[in-house]
Amino acid sequence: MTTATNRQDFKVADLSLAPFGRKEITLAEHEMPGLMSIRKEFAAAQPLAGARITGSLHMTVQTAVLIETLVALGAEVRWASCNIFSTQDHAAAAIAVGPNGTPEAPAGVPVFAWKGETLEEYWWCTEQALTWPNTPTGGPNMILDDGGDATLLVHKGVEFEKAGAAPDPSTADSEEYAHILTLLNRTLGEAPQKWTQLASEIRGVTEETTTGVHRLYEMHRDGSLLFPAINVNDAVTKSKFDNKYGCRHSLIDGINRATDVLIGGKTAVVFGYGDVGKGCAESLRGQGARVIITEIDPICALQAAMDGYQVATLDDVVEQADIFVTTTGNKDIIMAKDMARMKHQAIVGNIGHFDNEIDMAGLAKIDGIVKDEVKPQVHTWTFPDGKVLIVLSEGRLLNLGNATGHPSFVMSNSFADQTLAQIELFTKPEDYPTDVYVLPKHLDEKVARLHLDALGVKLTTLRPEQAAYIGVEVEGPYKPDHYRY
């Protein structure tokens, strides 16, 4: 583990990996035309000058291109990953070293991330990314979040400072929340107004994923949201591309790297038929699997049926399937009692953001069950009768734990959305009172345009009379906000 020097604060696995990381970042830049175009367009204007951005998002090669784009537009950045298994250590090392530094003299961005963090280490990293030495509030003035953990820590800190105390960690309903409470009890003792002071200058947060957006809307509904937010997840160029096409690529990549089993001919159950579920189902069917969908929503269930999938309940198919993939963003989707009914060497994995879709705690409590590591993030669980299950990434994101996540081109869409959302919130605070917003349609369309040349796409141009006929401008936007792509 490589930690800070006097010149820079960071904590990564191994700085000597930086040259490898830099090579992969250079390759990724070619595949990320959206971010590179934004760098070129805004480099002179420096719209993020004065921004102190705390990022909590998977520390991958693609994220490295995002970080260096934010810096190129004038921002200062501190970063942590949003998942204990998703960091690519060579990417983290390259960011800590920076494009002009060396492993011996790092000169990059403060980053706190390594693959295989404990939960205690994970929340320490998040705290470090939120802690800005020698600044007026000791914190950021912008947050770029994925899953909402950085935003959650700030809000819980403010809540407990206002109450004068944080709950005892022993009362927590999960191991992870116990670590959060331990951290906040410590900060209450060290600096009783740390989070309140830190939150006072935050102009807003841009949120990457469905789960984090859900948290934001909940906080807004109950009146506890402290600063405005842009819901990047529901930008069309994010949800219809990253969620679908990204998962279509990375799910089978993760399964293949983890298990090397032939997917063709097997039966796979995909839980949920939203954008993520659609991409996962398509990828498994493309490999020749027979795919079964479970759904609570009649509209999504009808879509799945019309797309040719069997739609059933888990109870009906749990003993038949070979592969189970949760994609819902909900909790308790596969319980221990369900896993006890699965066939020998069934593969169980999750591609939703958090680790509570699969009941890992319940599985561990089964009398006589034995857990064994096959390789990092691949474990067998042997039942007393000899039956074995293969569980990927301990129920966390298998596409990032067992593989490298979504490919660069699709992440260029999402991260271009994030960059433009950061510029929007930071430069126009008067336009965004505290609420949850979606990315303006003209910016959504801009992100799509930035990726067309790379694919050889030529757009047809509306004639003025055609534009007038359908009630739009020649240059767009072309669809109303309520349009469903």
From Swiss-Prot:
It is found in: Cytoplasm. One of its GO terms (cellular component) is cytosol. Pfam families: AdoHcyase (PF05221), AdoHcyase_NAD (PF00670). CDD domains: SAHH. May play a key role in the regulation of the intracellular concentration of adenosylhomocysteine. Its cofactor is NAD(+). Keywords: Cytoplasm, Hydrolase, NAD, One-carbon metabolism. It comes from the Bacteria. NCBIfam families: ahcY (TIGR00936), PRK05476.2-3 (NF004005). NAD(+) binds at residues 209-211, 243, 272-277, 295, 330, 351-353, 399. It catalyses: S-adenosyl-L-homocysteine + H2O = L-homocysteine + adenosine. Substrate binds at T60, D146, E208, K238, D242. The gene is ahcY. One of its GO terms (molecular function) is adenosylhomocysteinase activity. This is Adenosylhomocysteinase.
